[in-house]
Amino acid sequence: MPRSLKVAPDQLPKVHLAIQRKGYPSQKQFAADVVPSLSTVKKFLKGDAIDYENFRELCDKLDLDWQELVCIPENISLVSTLPQFEGEGELSPFNPSYPVAHPAGFFGRSRELHRCFGLLKSRPLQNIAIIGAKKSGKTSLLKHLAQITVTPPQQLRSDQKSDWLPNPTQYKWVFVDLQDPRLGSRDGLFKHLLRAIGLTIDTCDLEQFMDLMSTHLQQPTVILLDEIDAVLKRDCDLDDLFWESLRSLASHHSGGHLAFILTSREHPTHLAAHTGHSSPFFNIFGYAPILGALAESDARTLVQSSPLPFAPDDIDWIITQSECWPFLLQLLCQCRLEALQHPELEETWKQDGLEQLKFYLQK
């Protein structure tokens, strides 16, 4: 798949108008306010191809829906041409710092995948709560659900199933990071959700949001609410009335096309009770898997995916010390791989790994 995107020629006027609307007197001033360089900004504004992440960054800065602006080659669908991985260069084989970036790096959870996709195959779509301790892989599973069905088979491992849905390109997946303060208010969240279904507005109240969503939801849409704990424990305007409206939208005003999948450290009904919320929204999650350690067979498959093979004794040690928890597996595998790449670390990698394990387990 292409690793870069460009603005469609007929969308360039919209981009330049957005620059003016935002009050930037020049390209240089705009470039000073974003991460991408001035040369990248100039390419973007001319309709030349730039890196996927830079394209998304610039569109977000201008409050534009990147999916509306992107130039798509003829006879190729948007979903199948967009890159499924972050940044430039090869994917890091082990990365404990971030959720799994690409489906090929996701291991295990087959039971959860079967159940989740089974609930999303037919109308009405059903709601799911993914529960687990910190760093149990909740966000990775959430992102995997959105990516796996539209990732080309040649980019997956031979043992991975991807044909979970009958018509995967019909589905729209909307990821919401509720730890992002910009999405922790009605205004920010409304704009984010409406942009995802192709609507860009300046202001929106709850009634307008309900009207717009119920009118424009024409395809299966799954809203992924990651770390819902963050907003329920925060003093914000996402109150019971807001959550009740989301329940009403999914249950009565979306034609069965809308589902919510949330992640939390405890069941949403318990979380709501602990944080003073009484909305019936938190009772609509019939399937609520609790993520634990991986099955040992899946953990071994993960460890054996190293680009440099580990010795059997090292694999056994990693399995034992990690107890098959995905984050700890990733951490220890990273230590072992670095030692293979840098021989001076050979005598210390186990001790380094144990110290890191101790640090994270105490947090």
Give the location of each predicted region.
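Walker A/P-loop-proximal flanking segment of P-loop NTPase domains
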Residues: 81-148, 155-163
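A short, Lys/Arg-rich alpha-helix, primarily the initiator
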Residues: 1-33
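Mid-core helix/loop region of P-loop NTP-binding domains shared across ATPases and GTPases
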Residues: 184-257
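Recognition helix of helix-turn-helix/homeodomain-like DNA-binding domains
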Residues: 32-50
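Short regulatory helix/loop adjacent to the ATP-binding pocket of P-loop NTPases
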Residues: 267-285
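Winged-helix-like regulatory helical subdomains adjacent to P-loop NTPase cores
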Residues: 300, 308-363
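Conserved small helical "lid"/interfacial subdomain of P-loop NTPases
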Residues: 286-314
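Short, basic-rich loop-to-helix N-cap that marks the start of a DNA-contacting helix
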Residues: 46-60
